[in-house]
Amino acid sequence: MKKDDLSKKLTPLQYEVTQNNATEPPFNNEYWDNKSEGIYVDIISGKPLFTSLDKFDSGCGWPSFTKPIVKENIKANTDFSYNMKRIEIRSKDSDSHLGHVFDDGPKDKGGLRYCINSASLKFIPKEALEEEGYGEYLKLFNKKEE
């Protein structure tokens, strides 16, 4: 999708985050404290990125996950902005900036913390997965209930 089209589809914050690598404010974003079951998809491509089953409260003020739902849907780049060396996470298909990954996540879940901007995500509640075309991911939640 062209940048002109994206600026019409996205809110100004979503555009700044996904296209210009901005960071939204901590504790003042849509999903940092979302506790509902479902999946988080790329706001642009709709590709599945994360699941609520892997979301945890890291205390940082942004949605944090221990792993992606489909590893092939994201890519990692070294980021040297703000005089730091970090690993930036981008959506593979839309090349949107999502956030960063750090090695301070829960050790029993692999030790990673994917710190993601809410503005780069769309949440699909568990109840709407089938209707929204993500029915194949219902099995993740059904396993939990067994």
Swiss-Prot record:
GO terms for biological process: protein repair; response to oxidative stress. SUPFAM superfamilies: Mss4-like. The keyword ATP-binding does not apply. Residues 3-126 form the MsrB domain. Its EC number is 1.8.4.12. The keyword Oxidoreductase applies. Keywords: Oxidoreductase. It holds the Pfam family SelR. The active site is at 115 (nucleophile). GO terms for cellular component: cytoplasm. GO terms for molecular function: peptide-methionine (R)-S-oxide reductase activity. It catalyses: L-methionyl-[protein] + [thioredoxin]-disulfide + H2O = L-methionyl-(R)-S-oxide-[protein] + [thioredoxin]-dithiol. Belongs to the MsrB Met sulfoxide reductase family. NCBIfam families: peptide-methionine (R)-S-oxide reductase MsrB. This is Peptide methionine sulfoxide reductase MsrB. The lineage of its organism: Bacteria, Bacillati, Bacillota, Clostridia, Eubacteriales.
